[in-house]
Structure formats: C-alpha cells, structure tokens
Amino acid sequence: MGYDSQVRTKKRHRITVVCTNCKKRKSKCDRTKPCGTCVRLGDVDSCVYLTDSSGQPESSPSLNDADPLRKQSTPAERISPGFIKKRRSSQTRQDEDHWQRVRELENQSSLYYLPIHEETPFFIDLIPNGFYLETKRSADNLFGLFTDRAIENRDPYLQAMVTFRSIAIKKMMDKLGSNGNNVKNGSLPKSFEALSTFDADDERHISDDVVGKGNNFRMHQTIHKSLFNKFAQYRENNAKKFSSETILAKDYLPPLKILESEVLALFEEKIYNMIPIFDMKVLRHEITIFYQNIVEKGNPISIKHYDHMVFCIILLIIKICRLSVQFSKLTPYIYPVLQEIDTSKFLALVKHYLFETKVLRKCNLLQLQCLILLRFLHWCAPEDGDGPETQYCQILMGTIISSCKEMGINWYCFSHPEKYSFKINRHTRPSYDIMKPSDYISVFRKIWSYVLFWDRKMCFISGEECQIGKTLQCHFKEEADTPTWYIRMLTLDNLMKKINDTLNDDPGKVDLNLLHRLINDLKRNFHILKSLSKNEKETMRHFDFEMEWIIDLFSLSLLHGEMIFYEYDCNITKFYKSFQDLWDMVIHISEKCYNYFFNSDALEVDSLTKFYTNRIVEIVANKVLVIVPAFILRGDRFKTIQYADKKKMIEFLYGVSSVYFNEFGFEYYRCFRKMFTAKIAYKILNRSCEKDAWRIILKFLLNELKLEDNGDSYIDYNDMRLNDICPIILEFQETVQKYDGYRPDILSIWNNEFYPIGKYNDDMTGFKFQMRIKEMQEFLDMEKYSDRFNIFSSFYDHASSQLAKHTEVDTNISITNEQVAEIPQKELLQQPLAPALPVNDLIVSEFDVIEDIFDPVDFVSFF
C-alpha cells in the first residue's frame, strides 16, 4: 500500500482509558479528569479522553480549547472574515492544501519521544537575591527578570563588580568636587555629571600641551564635545514647551504634494508593515482634509475636532520616515527633501497635544493610533524614549492596552466579529462616509494583533510580565485572514503566553524543563510559519529576523539564570555544563552581531528597515557586554582556563565593546551613556596575572565595610549603606571574621567556605572548557577600526598629570602591611586553609585599592 493510500485510510478511533496527552507522551496516566501527570505538567486544558468511535474528546469547554468559529457565515464574517470553521465545504482547494501542509508539519514535529527526565518538573530560582527595585527622584522602577540590573543583582560576581564601580566613581567625584572641578550641564541628566567632570579635568590639565598631542587629540576633543552637545540637544528639544495659540502647522509640515509623493509613499511601501494600524485610504483622506482646512486656509488647529491628533500623526510619520532614511546609510540623494525637514521639535509638539486631551480618561481611534506611533518611535529613535533597559515603556504600553480594551479592541474582534453593533455618530472622526463598521473591524484586528505581539515581545526581551492576560488558539486562512505579519503570529500567542506564565507566576520557582519544552515548541512552530511564507515579499523579512533574535535573547538570559542557580545550589556537573552552554550562546550571538554589521547583505534585511532592526541588535549586543565579565571573574575556578585564556576573554570583551560602541555609540543616546561604565568594567578586568581583579574587588569592598563601621566612609546619611546595597559582602565579612584574628587569603575563604562550589575543580567531572577561539577570531583581531577613530578605545584616554594629588590618601598602616603577597588563584584552589595576616590588616587606603586596578595615568580618563 502506498503512502497516499495510507493517508486516505480512515482510522477507527478506539475508546481510550488514558488521556490523549499521556498516550502521546507514553507516560503513566492515573485516568482521572484531569490526570495527575497533566496537572503536574500544566496541560490541564488539553487533558482529554476519547470516549466514542467518532473520536470526539470528552472534556468540558475552556477558553483555550473553545472553537470560536461560527457555524454559519454571517454578514460580518463575509465582510471581514476571521476565525474559520474547520469544514471541508467552507474552504477552497488552496486553503485545504495549505492547512494539510500545516497539519503534516505539526504531526511530524509533535510525535517525538520525550525523555522522562525532561517531562519531570525541575524548578530553579531566578531571584536568589530578590527582585531589583530602584527608587530615585524622577522614577521608581521594578526591573524585569532579564534586564541588566536584574542580571547583575542575580549574579554575585557582577553585583560586587558593579558596587565597586559605583563607589570608585563616587570617591573620585568627591575628590574632584572638593577642588571645585565639578561640571554640570543642565540639559543632561545627573548621571552625566561624572562624565563631564572627568573630561573637563582631563582637558584642563593638558591644555598647555595641545600642540604636542597633534591631530589625534584635536579630533578626540571635537568628536567628544559634539556628542555631548548632540545628546544635550536631544533632551532640550524634547523638553521644549509650546502654546497652542502660537503653533502654525505650516511652519512644521512640508507641502501636501511632497508629503504624499515622498513621505507617505515611503511609509506605505517600507514602514507600514511594521506598524499596520491604519486603513491607508482613510489616513490619506484625513491628511488631505487637514491640509485643506488647516494648512492651506490657515485655520487654527482645533482640539475639539481632533485636528491636533491628525497633526501629531503626520509629525510622527515624518519623523519615523526620516529615521528610516537616516539609518539606512544610503546616499543622501535618496529622499533629499525628507532629509531636509527639521524634525527636532516634533516629539515635543506631540507630547504637548497628547496631554491637551483627556488621555487618562477616554480615547478615540485617532488618539490611540497616535499613542501607538509614539510607542513605536520610542523603540526606534536614538533618543532615550524607553530608557537604557526598556524600563520606561510599560506605562505608555499600559495606557495603550487600557485604551484598546475601553474601545472594544480585544480578542472579540477575532472570536466574535459578528457580535459588534456600531453606532457611529455624525461628528466621529473618521466619519461614517469614509469608515464603515467593517472597516472598523479590520482596523481593530490590525491594532489588537500589533499591540498583543508587542506585549509578548517585551516579556521575551526584559522578562517583564505580560499586561494582556488572555490568549486564544487561532487558525486563519493563508491569504484572506492574514493581511499582516502580526495577525499571522497570533497562532503563536498561546505558546508565548504560556512561556510568560511559567516565567512570571513564581520567579522563585520556575519549571525549567517546561520552559525548555515551550521554547522548543515556539521555535518549531515559528519555523513552520516561516516555511509556509517563503514567497513573502522581502519587505517582511525583518520581522522574522527580529523574532529569531528575540528568542535567542530569551535563551541567553535564561541560561545565565540557570547557571547562577546551579552555582548557588552546588550542582557541579550542571554548573559546568551551563557555564559552557552560556559561553557558546554568547559566542553564537556575537557572531550574529558581527554579521549584522559587516555582512548585512547576507541577512537579506532591507537597509530602510535597519532603524527598526537596530534596536533588537543593540539590546542583544549589550547583553553580551553585561554577561562576559561574569566569565572573566569566574575564570580562575577552572583548571582548564589558564591566564592566557582569560586574556583572550578580555580581548573578546574589547572587540565586542569596540563594535557595539562604534556602530551605535555615535547615534544612540542610551549606548553613549553605557560607555562610561563599560570602559570601567574593561579597566577592572584587564589586569596582569598577579593582580587578580576579583581579589582586589573583594579586598576593596571588605575595606569599605570596615570604614562604614568606623564612621569613616564617604557615604552620608542620605545614602544607602554598603551592607544594604550588596548584602552578600556583609555575609562574606562575617565569614572572614570567624578566623579569630588570623585568616587565609580572602579568595580561599570565598571559594572554599563562603561559596563552596569553588572548592570543586573540573578534574572531578572531567570537564574541559571549550574557548571557541575560531569563532571568536573576528573580535580578537579587531582591525575594523584601525584606520579610523575607535570611540571605545580613544575616549578619555588622555591622562591628567594631577591624578596622583587626587588619589593620595593618608594611611594608618605601614607600606609593608599593605603589600600583601598576591598568590595566583590556581594555587589557592589546591592548598588547604592556613593562617596568614591579622584580620584588621584588611583596613587599607581605599585609594590604594583603586590605584591597584586603574593605572594612575588613566583613572580620571576612564569613560
């Protein structure tokens, strides 16, 4: 019998005594409803039994299992079709072939054997040090599980390094401030004060030697000042205030003919698919009416008639289109008129008008579309709209989601489109003449699918909990029902929501095996969707590109949390495995970043969409810079990681930093800010063999705790104490103090007593770390910037001759007591604990420790 005849053979559905899930998994079933295995694995909704020969499952209906398909085609469905009844008579032959391919692919991918150890729940703690909450003058933030701050708070090595870094900066700022050298720029945030102060001190003391510095120094100063001025101008423009009476639309908008031929044409061809929230026919109509009544006749912009919302939409579209051309790196002769439009005040104008309406009480369609465009702009623009860690996006996103629900834009526009009964008043904008109920349903669907995906996307990027708490399982026709990429992705929403729930229901008890299965299912189903749309236009490829990077980013962040859990749990074998897996993932992602910058043609991403794809690449590359120091600080724990290997890791960090900051630091405000701390981290880690960075950090922080206890610390009553900021160091101090006046080397205590996983070595497991030198080579031979200005290596590398005066501090102990013999970590791991110096010899000059990390000639110059 051939394959085709086998497929057509009708199978008899026998009555099952076990549920269909257990039958497919080949696992034990207790035959209850739902069975214990499905309850344990979180598959309660799909736990069904076949009870008759027709194969109909016996199960109570639930939200996720309910088929929201109507038995008869209604007028609303004929106008704007949505969910389809799985009936052979209602489908065309093309649709049958399409979904036959879907079912075949799904069946092939789902009938795999699941090992028993993978279906058993395995829980890990992603918040071993609790949630990270920061309060400051302007904002309070609870950082998502996968943000930089949360990762640093979870990892004891990164937490200690970041704490040391902040104290070192504060001490140097106090020294420079006491000499009256503080430099402030009112247009920049307070966090820029250290950057400006160090730079001004550097320039002040070398100004007499400008001739000797030559052209390199002049170029350095010119670029440096221009960037500071540019980012200060960003903030000044966005903070500008307006009076509605003085705003004339014609002062900001190009002529209608240019808007239609250049701006709207570019928007519709290249950008609309990224943010498909409009009916373009309706949008063009509203823009034409606005120009006729406001721009050409000179009438004031009416808030009552929502002219101001149309005005804001035009401004945002122009600004987004200009960003598209700006970041495409194409010749300036493309779209020349668009590039000449001054968009610097556009964002301030939009913010002015948005709050002229009762945005926190009610919303209409134009206002919602304006809010979504603003959210999109915050994501793409070089200004700091979302914050350096996307921590400022949830309030605007929450406003958008609440407005959608208030307006009836929700799952009902897919599950019950025929149930919508409209009353469109005569003064509604857009008017009934141009926008009928069927058009509303169509736009509602586009908006909901877009907002829903962005809500899920932020969970994968930052680990924050989704704000939309409901999901449905969807199937659509191939052509008629998937006009946008976001609607097609609705078929993945159920999986993405399950991943969110598994991660955020209890971050202290996350089922890792379930999360891995869900991620694998998501990858597989996404691959199926991609394979079914190979004929898609090139303009859609950036969406698939972003989705792949989002999944990789989630996997990277989860791997780091997994490694930290095994380390705390002293699970030696799994710690070594996750250490290697995380490093391999870092290398893999770094290679992808390199190809994005230097081999972008192979990625088949339209250059006019790079203003959008740059954002996810920037977030992923930054995550690599955050995680790599964790490997370097832990390197001495592994016998197979020699000093030469650590130097390769440091070279790799330098290479990735150079690529990241040279490609993004000149344009993106948030990247420019991060260069300050990234340069310090590099200086901390780039030490000689006898000056182990981790030993110095521990020594410094223990000393700082002692100074706090003696009342000699720099911290005043308004600051949190070190034992509150980094409690693990306080616990370590208590362990050190148990040695009754004598102590072994502090690294020996850390590795063997306080953090006991360190007393095990890789000989016990046969683990051999794989450095992947071949894959790292592009970053080790960083010649891309040898013939031009390297912003990461060049900025702040001119020393102040007065640094010694700033860092000289009296000490109460002799130099001989300060010069503790430095024993390499490799030897410490193999030696028993032995008495050494008195505990009180931990009290050393804080600036001596700083100078032990930063060379005197470049401490002030670090960026």
Swiss-Prot record:
Record function comment: Transcriptional inhibitor with a significantly increased number of target genes in response to oleate.
DNA-binding region(s) in UniProt: 18-47
Pfam families: Zn_clus (PF00172)
CC annotations in GO: cytoplasm; mitochondrion; nucleus
Region (Disordered): 52-99
InterPro entries associated with the record: OAF3 (IPR050675), Zn2-C6_fun-type_DNA-bd_sf (IPR036864), Zn2Cys6_DnaBD (IPR001138)
Protein family membership: Belongs to the OAF3 family.
CDD domains, sorted: GAL4 (cd00067)
Locations listed in the record: Cytoplasm; Nucleus; Mitochondrion
Recorded name of the encoding gene: OAF3
Additional information: Present with 149 molecules/cell in log phase SD medium.
GO molecular function, one term: DNA binding
Record bears the keyword Cytoplasm: yes
Biased composition (Polar residues): 52-63
Protein name: Oleate activated transcription factor 3
Sorted UniProt keywords: Cytoplasm, DNA-binding, Metal-binding, Mitochondrion, Nucleus, Repressor, Transcription, Transcription regulation, Zinc
Biological processes per GO annotation: cellular response to oleic acid; negative regulation of transcription by RNA polymerase II; positive regulation of transcription by RNA polymerase II
